[in-house]
Amino acid sequence: MKIQIIWLTLVLIVVEANAVKQGKNATIPALIVFGDSIMDTGNNNNLPTLLKCNFPPYGKDYPGGFATGRFSDGRVPSDLIAEKIGLAKTLPAYMNPYLKPEDLLKGVTFASGGTGYDPLTAKIMSVISVWDQLIYFKEYISKIKRHFGEEKAKDILEHSFFLVVSSSNDLAHTYLAQAHRYDRTSYANFLADSAVHFVRELHKLGAQKIGVFSAVPVGCVPLQRTVFGDKELDGVILYINVYDTLFDMIQHPKKYGFEVADRGCCGKGLLTISYLCNSLNQFTCSNSSAYIFWDSYHPSKRAYQVIVDNLLDKYLSKVY
């Protein structure tokens, strides 16, 4: 527990020190998101990576039933948060080649499924690193200035909500590949330093209102239960504060109206993710709302909604 608490505290100190609270009637002009598959709305679609989900049954509960590249049966937290703060029902992926300049005004997500703070994570998965996401963010601000002027760019930087959601893939996958260099404590410290550095770099670029989600209880998702069983994967992996809600949902599913917590809806739900979750798999459930997880790693649309409803107002009230 001590490692996670230190990590979370380090990140939140940076965020809150740089946040200037606005008046009660303040509006949020845009939502800008960085991170991994939890927030990816399609940035991986045109990448040379196996971590894609722009095919059925992904998106079966999305408006129109379309598979858009979201790692869930429906909308993901970036969409739900954008709607909750009054911007739009969906948040566009920055890498969408069909985006028009006006589509940028209410925000975008740079998140890329499979990435993390550790540069090796993105390299292994052939996805967009969080550090490259910062480069794309600079490009985004340049586009805003070019099409809508300096004042609009200033408004977005000063008053938008910036959200960073990463580290789950570092903990679930890359840590084991880095075991020759790090033990659990030193790897946690490396990720903590990386998280703080990322937030500081984002603030240097002008962001003022930054929220940071810590890692999900990775050892409790179906894939990790299946692969690692009862091996010792506690410590940094299990109990990070921001996802207390998800951990409680996994431990007490009926409390939140769920029936299944130990496997995903897609396929048999234990080792079913990306291309293994496909329309040929005859075992996909008919009622994803009964499941906390959609596939073996990602929560269902309904689970995401519970998390957003439980956390967003509490944390937004600190800076707005």
From Swiss-Prot:
Which Gene3D superfamilies does the entry mention?
Answer: SGNH hydrolase (3.40.50.1110)
Q: Which UniProt keywords apply?
A: Glycoprotein, Hydrolase, Lipid degradation, Lipid metabolism, Secreted, Signal
The record places the active site at 37 (nucleophile), 295, 298
Which compartment or compartments is the protein found in? Answer: Secreted
Glycan attachment residues as annotated in the record: 25, 287
Give a Gene Ontology cellular component term annotated to this protein: extracellular region
A Gene Ontology molecular-function term? lipase activity
EC code(s) of this entry: 3.1.1.-
Membrane spanning stretches:
none
CDD domains, per database record: SGNH_plant_lipase_like (cd01837)
What biological-process terms (Gene Ontology) are attached?
lipid catabolic process
What the entry lists under Pfam families is as follows: Lipase_GDSL
Q: What is its main location?
A: secreted
In the record, the note on similarity to other proteins reads: Belongs to the 'GDSL' lipolytic enzyme family.
Name by which UniProt lists this protein: GDSL esterase/lipase At3g43570
Source species of the chain: Arabidopsis thaliana
